[in-house]
């Protein structure tokens, strides 16, 4: 029985992947057209264990709408406790994230894309920010959350 429990725990860690398509996530997106891609299985908060890449981020205009697109790379929906995807932002590399949007997991299949518009917040400081997406599984047989981040530069409105 212990062997079965350990095997199920191992399997749970391989389910429920998420990748951020737009803006491009930190690191690579190797193999994302196949369910279960390693680049979509990052469980270390707040950014999947990937370091900032501030000189590679895209520029966003404060106060404008921007479409964030994520991929549910591998489904882990549980009808009795459905999860969600959150889109969050913080200035720079430190501090608290502020939730900008939430998408409910309705049991769409692996490789499904989700897009939502956010209003880019006005920067308080130097304009560099971290955009974070989190897949909150709410499934006790899986990791609680999967993380991706993108580095962005927020430009003030003229």
What spans do the regions from the language model cover?
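Cleavable N-terminal signal peptides of Sec/SRP-targeted secreted and luminal proteins
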Residues: 2-16
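Serine/threonine-rich low-complexity intrinsically disordered regions
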Residues: 1-2, 61
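Structured recognition/catalytic domains enriched at protein termini
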Residues: 15-158
């Amino acid at each position: 029985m212990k062997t079965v429990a350990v095997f199920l725990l191992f399997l749970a860690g391989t389910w429920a992947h998420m990748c951020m398509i737009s803006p491009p996530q930190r690191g690579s997106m190797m193999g994302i057209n196949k369910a279960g891609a390693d680049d979509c299985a990052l469980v270390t908060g707040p950014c999947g264990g990937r370091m900032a890449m501030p000189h590679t981020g895209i520029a966003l205009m404060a106060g404008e709408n921007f479409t964030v697109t994520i991929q549910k790379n591998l489904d882990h929906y549980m009808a009795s406790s459905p999860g969600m995807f959150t889109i969050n932002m913080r200035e720079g590399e430190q501090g608290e994230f502020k939730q900008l949007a939430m998408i409910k997991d309705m049991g769409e299949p692996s490789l499904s894309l989700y897009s939502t518009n956010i209003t880019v917040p006005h920067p308080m400081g130097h304009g560099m920010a971290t955009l974070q997406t989190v897949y909150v599984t709410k499934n006790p047989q899986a990791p609680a959350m999967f993380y991706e981040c993108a580095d962005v530069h927020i430009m003030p409105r003229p």
